[in-house]
């Protein structure tokens, strides 16, 4: 992969190298314990959490006795970087904040108190991956304290620890690796990636090339799927490039768009100087990796690779301005000796300076690409096992509802949770079906789940009374299980089972197996089950997803009963620059600014046939953005755009489906 060892270690390096190792998230504590046991003088690295604007509002509200619901009313839509002294401007510029009652009582009191504590230290937390290793007792250098799990943690944060010259290692918890392991374990045959090459597998290539990568590590976000389609990624090298150019440093500089155009032959490949062609020809003359800084500094200024790595490190987010000036003079003088014209060498330096601090290490990008290819292979060949693992590990860009719908689009049957069949985790009950795990049921404790799985080994539950007697769940647990359908098929309707559970829980706790009420449970009348729409709503409330149909079915919209005049997501490829009307629930979003500094928004909506991307340019965002405070569903009128074969919708009008299709359209 043409990785530069000097990026890791070189003679001129004054500090320890960067060591980042990813492990499955559910084994990270095990690996930390291993490092503590093996190297002894070890501590986790702390981070110092401060009260941001939203956390200051929450803490102030709680201290003043307000409910979480009241506090969330003003915090949930505020930007994380909101300035509490400038809330009026936020309300005027961000549509979702337009109706927030900043001036009304009691919110004005909460805000006044929050202003006084915003920015103050809140507590010591633990760095997401960092730990420090020493050759002597760490307490000789750093004060320590214990974490709730019993590990020792530094009271200094990352930068002072590095300044002390100690070895820092990042052991990162990665859910994507756990997904891979769980999928392989679930498949009823051995999958050996030392013998299988996902890169050359046709089904895997097609899945990546077409951007059908929801659930796949690192390559599932809307922006990344869009990029995969634009590049028509067909090799490990190109996926490695894509993993880097999606990063903020390359993307925000305009280099990502230049890379796409040059890759597709729509823009000529140019170089600021012929020497750059020697080192940047594979990336169309564009720096996209940290290693590119090393190569350019070496080729243009004659710097050694070790010296060039020192330059790159100095340009990181933790800049040393005095050393930066030294490196700048060294670079420009070296470039001058190599005959580079002044204007050209200054322009090359400007490119390096604006890029180096936010670029991606190629070794990191290549490692990510390898895991991404394996994930794509598993999704292409074992979709049920793969999607069950994604749902179980609760990782990724989307919520469980989006992954359930993706599984449904793959032809996988979604089976609701059931006390006689479900495990704790999601699992593939057969090659084309996923059974929802009891872990997804709200209000259900892990101890109750474990009790259900253990006790039913002695015999399945025959009735609601049998279940209540053997498991003795809390009333809230029994109610949630009934409403989500986990007790369906036990001979009674949901309302009848709920009444029986209610009566059973009103008995004397020490005598629950014997009737102590005048009402005989056996005489409870049978009530009919609720309609399907009510069941669907109950699934949303108890599972935070819909097991039996897409959420828009609540409004009578299904593939078989599609409203006239509406375009499905799967049919967007048939249109180009056409005006259409579409509908969907909100899956995710991204706010950004134009080059003029105006706010705009990208949103991802989903109908039963797929996810589609919608662009709200500043004028439309200001006009309709205020309704984007919930998940929808929404109706969008707009124009379908064709961007290098990828279809998106540019919104011209946005409305809420909650008001009814006919009234919204009119």
Feature map (PLM): residue ranges:
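Hydrophobic beta-strand positions in extracellular immunoglobulin-like domains
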Residues: 586, 638-640
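Hydrophobic core residues within well-ordered beta-strands of beta-rich domains
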Residues: 580-582, 601, 627, 634
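OB-fold (S1/OB) nucleic-acid-binding surfaces
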Residues: 594-619
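OB-fold/S1-family single-stranded nucleic acid-binding modules
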Residues: 641-664
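OB-fold nucleic-acid-binding modules
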Residues: 534-590
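Short nucleic-acid-contacting surface segments enriched for D/E, G, S/T with interspersed K/R
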Residues: 620-637
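Alpha-helical scaffold/interaction cores of sigma-54-like transcription cofactors
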Residues: 1-496, 501-509, 513, 590-593
